[in-house]
């Protein structure tokens, strides 16, 4: 199993020195990925217990990961897109491509839970088509209602080309379906073993109904943990088919965050860690 950390752009990690130190420590310990929250503003009051407090500082994810690309070598850098991202294909194509360009091919893009909510209207599908065209076509073009493209270029393109990895977040049938049809992976919110098992059962149902392009490869599943699972539960996650555990950074001081990463590595890595790629 792989391990990632979520929230490298918020809380105490909104301080650049803290974020760099945590990223380098995570890479040294064996984590494989940094995931950023895509929030541009936070709801007040908190909508659920695992949400960040309304006054939590949040640095723009693209700015954060662009800086961390310079200070890390192998970590995957997962850019959290904000709700409403499907309204602007050019912006998110540029942000994803720029991150991938600066990080030597380590960029990935995380679509928010609300992305697939109105998939039936065609906005999201056209947004994805526009990104793929801008990233991979010599002559980017989309004939569409929402994101028509013609007579433009948007260099630099991603090092990974049109298949810069996309993740879809959310525990809903439409989010799973979108991940299967267009994504590298699905980020499943998982408060506990029961909710993870329910999510994996939903994935199995959607896989039976959906046709996934062979060009996308096998779907990866990451769980965004609400709390640290027990080793027994983590073993059950593996048996269910989970590929990665993504852990939320607690909203604490730098020293506490460093200790958190070290405690996670000590608790899990000897028994569960797959070596990061690259």
Describe each PLM feature range.
Residues 1-278:
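Active-site-adjacent structural elements that line small-molecule/cofactor binding pockets in enzymes
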């Amino acid at each position: 199993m792989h391990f990632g950390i979520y929230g490298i752009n918020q809380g105490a990690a909104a301080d650049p020195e803290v974020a760099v130190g945590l990223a380098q420590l995570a890479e040294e310990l064996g984590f494989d990925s940094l995931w950023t929250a895509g929030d541009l503003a936070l709801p007040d009051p908190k909508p659920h217990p695992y949400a960040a407090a309304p006054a939590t500082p949040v640095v723009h994810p693209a700015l954060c990961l662009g800086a961390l690309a310079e200070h890390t070598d192998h970590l995957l850098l997962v850019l959290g897109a904000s709700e409403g991202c499907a309204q602007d294909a050019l912006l998110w194509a540029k942000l994803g491509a720029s991150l991938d360009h600066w990080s030597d091919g380590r960029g990935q893009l995380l679509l928010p839970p609300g992305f697939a909510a109105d998939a039936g209207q065609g906005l999201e599908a056209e947004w994805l088509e526009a990104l793929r065209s801008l990233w991979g076509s010599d002559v980017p073009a989309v004939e569409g209602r929402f994101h028509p493209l013609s007579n433009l270029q948007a260099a630099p393109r991603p090092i990974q080309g049109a298949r810069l990895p996309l993740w879809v977040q959310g525990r809903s049938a439409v989010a799973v379906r979108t991940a299967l049809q267009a994504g590298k992976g699905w980020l499943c919110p998982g408060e506990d073993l029961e909710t993870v098992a329910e999510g994996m059962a939903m994935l199995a149902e959607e896989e039976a109904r959906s046709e996934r392009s062979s060009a996308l490869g096998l779907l990866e599943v990451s769980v965004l943990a609400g709390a640290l699972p027990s080793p027994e539960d983590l073993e059950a996650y593996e048996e269910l088919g989970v590929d990665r555990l993504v852990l939320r950074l607690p909203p604490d001081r730098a020293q506490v965050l460093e200790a958190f990463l070290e405690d996670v590595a000590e608790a899990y890595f000897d028994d569960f860690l797959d070596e990061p790629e690259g």
